């Protein structure tokens, strides 16, 4: 027997979640029906409020969901779907989200590009977890009409496909955000002969060349025309050979901190022209100022003399490796001095072998998000994710929404059915 949700409440509230509810209901009825005596017709009353609390009450076949936004509603609805047994009687769930923006960065640049249907499936999972952002990491895997070789033979998304994904994400209250590259990590784009004139090193653009910024404007225009949001992640990380290739031959040596600031200023001009709200990975700003590795900054560092980004540029602090809260504290102290717009990006640890390293994911996520909460970081995302990282994503979501630690003995070396039972609590 399938479940049928009957939505109740203010019409304006129902309109925000009606389509998404129908999609999740249909998916459940096709794939996840419970055996036994369960409620079929379930009346759901929805209310939205200003606070970040989520409260779900189930009294037999009557459910009340009081929440902040659609993404939180769908998390509550997913809990209801897993607690429909008549024998369970009355039950309730209370949680609070600690970050206004939270979500996943889906890696669509390495090994394979997710199909549109697979991205939609990931969106449904994010909705069930209560996350409200999805970043598509596409180095060269999106269509730029004026650059036919950009992403060719790489499974790039067409503009129509991105728009389709975007519209689907909006159904669940999830903001689809482009995450591209405008400095380094562009090996696949720069391998073509037509791109040689804008190349510094094999994967880095040459700073200061007018052709470089004409190229970047084409990228940003294509992105603006494909995505609903005005937010954009410009990348710019790990450009360790910046200024040491063709730039050095043509212009002589220039400190990387000056080059990154010059490049950011030019790209920001384009963003202002197009009405975009940019952010970048922060490592180049930090390493170019210290002359050391990203995390090698002193305790209580004074950044008053550092070259800093423009006020409107967000900085994304990425940290996939550390389990010590003191490291996160010193790094967030530096970021707070550099920008008022900080985003934290953790990692799902799927890149170290043929299987995800869940233990490392759990340990790092706990340390990172505990510290981000303490420092009131407004936005957090889980990075470099694929479908084999879903348990890590679930861990991330639970730290975002509620204070929960994932005891490894409940997860490691468990059967699929045991894992499902744990995740559906």
Predicted regions and their residues:
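Feature activates predominantly on carbohydrate-active enzymes
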Residues: 60-279
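Helix C-cap/helix->beta junction micro-motif
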Residues: 28, 171-172, 274, 338, ...
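Residue-level marker for buried hydrophobic side chains located in beta-strands
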Residues: 234, 316, 379-381
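Active-site beta-loop-alpha junctions enriched in small/polar residues
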Residues: 104, 109, 139-141, 179-185, ...
